[in-house]
């Protein structure tokens, strides 16, 4: 029996799917050429030739493992790699894999960029005050304030006749052991602090003067109707040298956006 023969037109038409020729591809050097046929929006048959450059890359084991996954659905018979008929390639994202040494260098660079955020109140260094190496030393603001207080107190005791300084009667030459006659209270260690803000409270006043020395009493002048601070206060220190230190340190000191004025309290009649 003779084999059944068909015409070449029938064989070509039988190979076409939906009236389109099959896709073809070939590799030439480092390039891969893929030829496809499809219908455009107008229903016309068009030929699409895509050119791929073949490159060899070193990828991580996870990426190589993903490329070997078995495809499913309409792409179960596709070869490794994307298929334009079932896969739409978006913008390529490049991933940079760094070793531990490179990560540490990058991390240190980022830390150096933001190191000026912290500023020490003690030595003005580029670190937090709690981590200052000079904390508790002579450069500490608290220690410096105590040193100024001691120096001012010593100057007040050693040089009571210096002009421009208030000297209580018991420290003047020829004075008796007792204070001035007719005085019921001793204001020799009292200071007047003025130019205070309206929001000043007794707690704020105590925080302001407690680092200088112990005090016996305080008085913060307030408005009767509003209860706001009138702008001045009196502080009676236990020791006169502490009062002198308060004037030396706090007079001209900026507090709550205002410049304080601290002076000896005038004797009250």
From Swiss-Prot:
PROSITE patterns xrefs: RRM
The keyword Protein biosynthesis appears for this protein: yes
Keywords, comma-separated and alphabetical: Cytoplasm, Initiation factor, Protein biosynthesis, RNA-binding
All copies of domain RRM, residue ranges: 189-267
GO CC terms in record: eukaryotic 43S preinitiation complex; eukaryotic 48S preinitiation complex; eukaryotic translation initiation factor 3 complex
Pfam families found in the cross-reference section: eIF3g, RRM_1
Domain of life: Eukaryota
Classification via SMART domains: RRM
Localisation per UniProt entry: Cytoplasm
GO-annotated molecular function: RNA binding; translation initiation factor activity
Biological processes, Gene Ontology terms: formation of cytoplasmic translation initiation complex
HAMAP family referenced in this protein's UniProt entry, alphabetically: eIF3g
Family listed: Belongs to the eIF-3 subunit G family.
Task of the protein: RNA-binding component of the eukaryotic translation initiation factor 3 (eIF-3) complex, which is involved in protein synthesis of a specialized repertoire of mRNAs and, together with other initiation factors, stimulates binding of mRNA and methionyl-tRNAi to the 40S ribosome. The eIF-3 complex specifically targets and initiates translation of a subset of mRNAs involved in cell proliferation. This subunit can bind 18S rRNA.
Assembly information from the UniProt record: Component of the eukaryotic translation initiation factor 3 (eIF-3) complex. The eIF-3 complex interacts with pix.
Protein name, entry field: Eukaryotic translation initiation factor 3 subunit G-2
Annotated source species: Drosophila ananassae
Lineage: Eukaryota, Metazoa, Ecdysozoa, Arthropoda, Hexapoda
Gene: eIF3g2
């Amino acid at each position: 029996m003779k084999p059944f023969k068909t015409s070449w037109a029938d064989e070509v038409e039988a190979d076409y799917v939906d009236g389109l020729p099959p896709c073809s591809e070939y590799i030439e050097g480092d390039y891969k050429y893929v030829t496809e046929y499809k219908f455009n929006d107008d229903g016309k048959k068009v030929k699409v030739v895509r050119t791929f450059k073949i490159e060899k890359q070193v990828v991580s084991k996870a990426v190589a493992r993903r490329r070997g996954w078995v495809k499913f659905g309409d792409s179960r018979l596709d070869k490794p790699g994307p298929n334009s008929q079932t896969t739409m390639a978006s913008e390529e994202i490049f991933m940079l894999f760094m070793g531990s040494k490179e990560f540490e260098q990058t991390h240190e660079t980022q830390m150096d960029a933001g190191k000026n955020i912290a500023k020490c109140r003690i030595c003005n260094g580029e670190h937090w005050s709690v981590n200052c190496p000079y904390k508790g030393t002579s450069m500490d603001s608290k220690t410096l304030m105590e040193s100024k207080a001691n120096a001012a107190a010593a100057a007040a005791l050693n040089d009571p006749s210096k002009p421009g300084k208030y000297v209580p009667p018991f420290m003047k030459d020829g004075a008796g052991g007792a204070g001035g006659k007719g005085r019921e209270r001793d204001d020799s260690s009292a200071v007047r602090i003025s130019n205070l803000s309206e929001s000043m409270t007794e707690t704020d006043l105590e925080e302001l003067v407690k680092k200088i020395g112990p005090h016996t009493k305080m008085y913060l002048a307030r408005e009767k109707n509003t209860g706001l601070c009138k702008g001045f206060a009196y502080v009676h220190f236990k020791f006169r040298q502490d009062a002198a230190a308060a004037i030396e340190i706090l007079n001209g000191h900026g507090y709550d956006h205002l410049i304080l004025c601290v002076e000896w309290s005038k004797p009250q009649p």
